[in-house]
């Protein structure tokens, strides 16, 4: 019979000498595994007399329990030592500056577009959209443009190559085709705005070949210029966030409205900066008018029963005026410094109830 005291001392010495979890597990298998030294002693109990089995069985089980407790304690100590070593190697100096991560921002044009849409949505306007590539009917003919109107020429409009039947598709020069499509597909009353990109052959400090518009259309019975005036003045007061907006309407000509007007706002131009609601100067800000009867007829609406007004404004230009951006071309220069200066936080979603900007 193996000397249990000697075996105990030997196994406990091996447990104490284990330097890592892998070595400790090898000691465990050798001692109390299925073929381990202590497990082997338990298998010899069957050949002993009842008295001897009782005495030796208790001693062997006590040895096994003592070894397992020693292994458990050693394992906990080794795991704690490994954790301490890993934490020491991963020490973070909290006094170091955090790494710089460049933040993106909402483009001023998109912010302005969202502001305009939010205001008109609160006024009961629905948003309508249409394709950027249009045909001549929706972009010109249905809007009462004469056949020889200058806007139909190549120097003012981006045309595609003619089709086999001679038809030329084009990049829309305004979002008015959306109004036409709405009047054709819906019955009055109609109250929509049409935001989107538009395209013209123009490029200077206040014009770009690609720009953004929001046009509005109201069709119903008994509509007149007073409704148009109130709508636009209410919008401008909300957009510029001031009740001091003073406006004037100047007679103008648009093929698709009659009468037509350009709307000016009073402003202060001193100091190289335009301030709306102050000063004695005037600034043209949008075009508008009563929908021409020919446009209503082209869309299948009886002008003797229904009237309407329409308006259109450049979103990029509105943003320039509100946020003091001097050159429209800078908006599309991809200058990160400019975008960082004039951009908006992604969390600053326009909301008329809590403020637009």
Swiss-Prot record:
EC number(s) stated in the UniProt entry for this protein: 6.1.1.20
Domain of life of the native organism: Bacteria
One BP annotation, GO: phenylalanyl-tRNA aminoacylation
Cofactor(s) for this UniProt protein: Mg(2+)
Residues that bind Mg(2+): 258
Cofactor note: Binds 2 magnesium ions per tetramer.
Keywords: Aminoacyl-tRNA synthetase, ATP-binding, Cytoplasm, Ligase, Magnesium, Metal-binding, Nucleotide-binding, Protein biosynthesis
GO CC terms, sorted: cytoplasm
Predominant location category: cytoplasm
Record has Cell wall biogenesis/degradation as a keyword: no
NCBIfam families hit by this protein: pheS (TIGR00468)
HAMAP family given in the database record: Phe_tRNA_synth_alpha1
Subunit structure and binding partners: Tetramer of two alpha and two beta subunits.
Designated name of the protein: Phenylalanine--tRNA ligase alpha subunit
Gene that encodes the chain: pheS
């Amino acid at each position: 019979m193996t000397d249990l005291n000697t075996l105990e001392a030997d196994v406990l010495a091996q447990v104490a000498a284990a330097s890592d979890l892998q070595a400790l597990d090898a000691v465990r298998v050798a001692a109390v595994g299925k073929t381990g030294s202590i497990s082997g002693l338990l298998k010899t109990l069957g050949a002993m007399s009842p008295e001897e089995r009782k005495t030796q069985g208790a001693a062997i089980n006590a040895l096994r329990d003592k070894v397992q407790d020693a292994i458990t304690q050693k394992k906990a100590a080794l795991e704690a030592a490994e954790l301490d070593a890993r934490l020491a190697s991963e020490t973070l100096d909290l006094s170091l500056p955090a790494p710089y991560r460049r933040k993106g921002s909402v483009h001023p044009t998109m912010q302005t577009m969202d502001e305009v849409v939010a205001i008109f949505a609160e006024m009961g306007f629905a948003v309508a959209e249409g394709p950027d590539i249009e045909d001549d009917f929706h972009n010109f003919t249905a809007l009462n443009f004469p056949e020889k109107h200058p806007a139909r020429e190549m120097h003012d409009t981006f045309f595609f190559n003619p089709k086999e039947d001679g038809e030329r598709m084009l990049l829309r020069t305004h979002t008015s085709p959306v109004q036409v499509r709405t009047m054709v597909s819906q019955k009055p009353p109609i109250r929509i705005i049409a935001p989107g990109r538009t395209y013209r052959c123009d490029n200077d400090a206040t014009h770009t070949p690609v720009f953004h518009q929001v046009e509005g259309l109201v069709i119903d019975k008994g509509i007149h210029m007073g409704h148009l005036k109130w709508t636009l003045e209410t919008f401008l007061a909300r957009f510029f966030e001031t009740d001091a907006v003073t406006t004037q309407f100047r007679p103008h000509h648009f093929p698709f409205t009659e009468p037509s007007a350009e709307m000016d706002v009073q402003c202060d131009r001193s100091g190289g900066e335009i301030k709306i609601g102050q000063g004695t100067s005037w600034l043209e800000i949008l075009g508008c008018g009563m929908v021409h009867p020919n446009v209503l007829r082209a869309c299948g609406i009886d002008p003797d029963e229904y009237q309407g007004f329409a308006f259109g404004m450049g979103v990029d230009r509105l943003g320039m005026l509100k946020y003091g951006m001097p050159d429209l071309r800078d908006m599309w220069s991809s200058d990160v410094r400019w975008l960082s200066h004039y951009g908006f936080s992604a969390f600053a979603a326009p909301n008329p109830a809590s403020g637009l900007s």
